[in-house]
């Protein structure tokens, strides 16, 4: 048999003929499924009965599919109908006929198959249904996902730190360029200077350092004779210069603000003395103002 189910499908874009108007109302079409069943032959609007429900049928269908691996809709539905017939015979209480009739069972099986297909648990080729397997979500998978996430987060943090370092380096270079331009304008600039990049070695002023340089100037051997030392690149030095400049600007700004505050207070006090009719120099003594 063939199964027909009525669906409302909104029409897709159609080529419009100049003399024909296309209606935008939903078009009723019929979905025909070759499964030799009578699912959907019941009247529209008939409610499904409660009871085991789709979940119960889904478990049974899943067990059948997993056991058979390759099967058909008709084979699965027939076996489940047979199983329910056996249950009905052995049941102490009579079962709901509407819930466990053949048409209702086939409809439930069909709904379960559609759900499994949407979840990629099964694959369907015409009438043949092939079992693909349930999604695997175990503790091991969760731990692997967490490890991958930690690796990604660590990589992001390293890249963020590297980006911050690059920004600081660019800012330091821009500050150095501005400083050099000002020096050239004011003092014509120094006769000699350092070129970038460079390396700075820091050690004790009294340390004895033995230096050997190859003839091609490509290899340098340094022996500090067990004296502690540090190696700094140009980026580190530029960063220190930038921090020093910012500190100087901060101190200068703070000093200027403090000076302006004192000048404003003195001017206010002097005006107060004139307004009161007194004259003479203003003297500061432990925060008090005296006039003579």
Swiss-Prot record:
Q: What does the tissue specificity note say?
A: Strongly expressed in the actively dividing tissues of the shoot apical meristem, young leaf primordia, the vascular tissues of the maturing leaf primordia and axillary buds.
Query: At which positions is motif DEF box?
Result: 101-135
Renumbered to this chain, region (Disordered) spans 1-25, 246-280
Biological processes, Gene Ontology terms = regulation of cell cycle
Q: Does the keyword Nucleus apply?
A: yes
Q: Which InterPro entries match?
A: E2F-DP_heterodim (IPR037241), E2F_WHTH_DNA-bd_dom (IPR003316), TF_DP_C_sf (IPR038168), Transc_factor_DP_C (IPR014889), Transcrpt_fac_DP (IPR015648), WH-like_DNA-bd_sf (IPR036388), WH_DNA-bd_sf (IPR036390)
Report the coiled-coil segments: 163-184
Q: What are the DNA-binding region positions? A: 51-135
CDD domains of this UniProt entry? Answer: DP_DD
What Pfam family does this protein match (any one)? E2F_TDP
Subcellular location(s): the record lists: Cytoplasm; Nucleus
Q: Name one GO cellular component term.
A: DRM complex
User: Does the entry feature the keyword Nucleus, yes or no?
Assistant: yes
Gene3D superfamilies attached here? Transcription factor DP, Winged helix-like DNA-binding domain superfamily/Winged helix DNA-binding domain
What drives induction of this protein's expression?
Up-regulated by the transcription factor ERF114.
Q: Which GO terms describe its molecular function?
A: DNA binding; DNA-binding transcription factor activity
Which intervals carry biased composition (Low complexity)?
252-280
Which keywords label this protein? Activator, Cell cycle, Coiled coil, Cytoplasm, DNA-binding, Nucleus, Transcription, Transcription regulation
Subunit composition and interactions? Heterodimer with E2F. Interacts preferentially with E2FA and E2FB, but also with E2FC.
Q: What does this protein do?
A: Involved in the regulation of the G1/S transition. Increases the DNA binding and the transactivation activities of E2F proteins after heterodimerization. The complex DPA/E2FA promotes cell division and acts as a regulator of the endocycle. Positively regulates the activity of S phase-specific genes.
What does its UniProt record remark on the domains? The DIM domain (143-214) is necessary but not sufficient for heterodimerization.
Protein name as catalogued: Transcription factor-like protein DPA
Q: Which lineage do the record's taxonomy fields give for this organism?
A: Eukaryota, Viridiplantae, Streptophyta, Embryophyta, Tracheophyta
Q: Which gene encodes it?
A: DPA
């Amino acid at each position: 048999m063939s199964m027909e189910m009525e669906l409302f499908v909104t029409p897709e874009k159609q080529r419009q003929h100049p003399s024909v108007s296309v209606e935008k109302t939903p078009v009723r079409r019929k979905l025909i499924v070759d499964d030799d069943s009578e699912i959907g032959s019941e009247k529209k609007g008939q409610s499904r009965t409660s009871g085991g429900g789709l979940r119960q049928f889904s478990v049974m269908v899943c067990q059948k599919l997993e056991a058979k691996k390759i099967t058909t809709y008709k084979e699965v539905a027939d076996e489940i109908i047979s199983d329910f017939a056996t249950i009905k015979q052995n049941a102490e209480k009579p079962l709901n006929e509407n819930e466990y009739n053949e048409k209702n069972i086939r409809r439930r099986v069909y709904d379960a198959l559609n759900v499994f297909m949407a979840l990629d648990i099964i694959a369907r080729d015409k009438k043949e249904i092939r079992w693909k397997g349930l999604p695997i979500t175990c503790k091991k998978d969760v731990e692997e996902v967490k490890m991958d996430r930690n690796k990604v987060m660590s990589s992001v943090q390293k890249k963020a730190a590297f980006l911050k370092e690059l920004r600081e380096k660019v800012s330091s270079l821009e500050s150095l360029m501005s400083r050099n331009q000002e020096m050239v304008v004011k003092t014509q600039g120094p006769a000699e200077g350092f070129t970038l990049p460079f390396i700075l070695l820091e050690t004790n002023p009294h340390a004895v350092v033995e230096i050997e340089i190859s003839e091609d100037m490509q290899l340098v051997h340094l022996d500090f004779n067990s004296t502690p030392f540090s190696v700094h690149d140009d980026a580190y030095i530029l960063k220190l210069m930038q921090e020093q400049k910012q500190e100087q600007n901060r101190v200068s700004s703070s000093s200027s603000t403090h000076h302006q505050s004192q000048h404003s207070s003195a001017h206010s006090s002097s005006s107060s003395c004139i307004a009161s009719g007194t004259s003479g120099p203003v003297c500061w003594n432990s925060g008090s103002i005296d006039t003579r």
